[in-house]
């Protein structure tokens, strides 16, 4: 094996590790979201409020990171970031709504279909190519989603449809992220814009129905 092949393999292994860690963190975030929404003895916090708090926490967390990195969160294309943030926020809200109606494992498994939608959108709108094996893998993956969504034959149950809609929105968000990445902005700017604009877009819907959390709910809410 050549040195170049070894370096490529190392990069691939790091990418797999990062993806595994990210998947674990997202699963933990989802579990905490469902916990604070359905646990008896706590305030009845809705999906919109949980989504707003998550985006707001992300924005606040990134501020000192931007300061340390000396990066100004500025872009010449705010409308493109707003489009991406809108689909992302819709996907998160819908996923949290799905948690309230179907088991967490089912909703999370259905959510993993978002890369299928991303691949389709990337081929249609971003000029990317997908070989036969990828299309075959996507078809098999979506068949698994259908099986999870309706194990009793009832695929059109409300919770599963909400989770599929969430996966579609998140797939659009990832495709839009690839789109905005071509604008030349730094990764920190893209990350900050996603959280900040997500909070701004959800705020008008979350604040009017705000429920003050119990003290123990603040940490998982963030």
Where are these regions (language model features)?
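Loop-to-transmembrane-helix transition segments
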Residues: 14-22, 70-94, 158-166, 212-222
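C-terminal transmembrane-helix exit sites in multi-pass transporters
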Residues: 97-100, 114-136
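Alpha-helical transmembrane segments of compact multi-pass small-molecule transporters, enriched
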Residues: 57-61, 110-124, 139, 196-201
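Glycine-/small-residue-enriched transmembrane alpha-helix faces in small-molecule transporters
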Residues: 1-48, 154-179
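Hydrophobic/small/kink-forming positions within alpha-helical transmembrane segments
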Residues: 23-31, 56, 63, 85-93, ...
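Transmembrane alpha-helices of multi-pass small-molecule transport proteins
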Residues: 43-90, 169-173, 193-208
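Hydrophobic transmembrane alpha-helices of multi-pass small-molecule transport proteins
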Residues: 133-150
